[in-house]
Amino acid sequence: MKSVRALIVDDSSVMRKIVERALRQAGIDLTQVFEAGNGAEALGVLQGNGVDLILCDINMPVMDGLEFVKQLSGVEQARGVPVVMITTEGSESHVVQALSCGARGYIRKPFTPDQVKEHVMPLLAANS
């Protein structure tokens, strides 16, 4: 599998590092990791950078993860890039809402590297 450029969007800098570590422990070859603290920051990051994978929280200030995913359709650099939500929101309605907004995966916090691998690897393989 090719090396991956990932964007991790979460309002917690600690959680962004935990997600990055989980990706690496899952065996994903990360060549570049971009970070953003909310959806608006993430849209700014995408304006100048192409990525292969986006992992995003739902509950964030300024612009939440669901609104961010909705707005991705208007960002050329994000077309076709798989988005996986990683969040504490675990209700069925949140999962359905995230998937209907355009997310391709949903992982509940807390999570293990194996769960990240299980959700992310098929998406990366399909996009390679």
Predicted regions and their residues:
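Two-component/phosphorelay signaling modules centered on CheY-like receiver
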Residues: S13-F34
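C-terminal output helix
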Residues: F111-M121
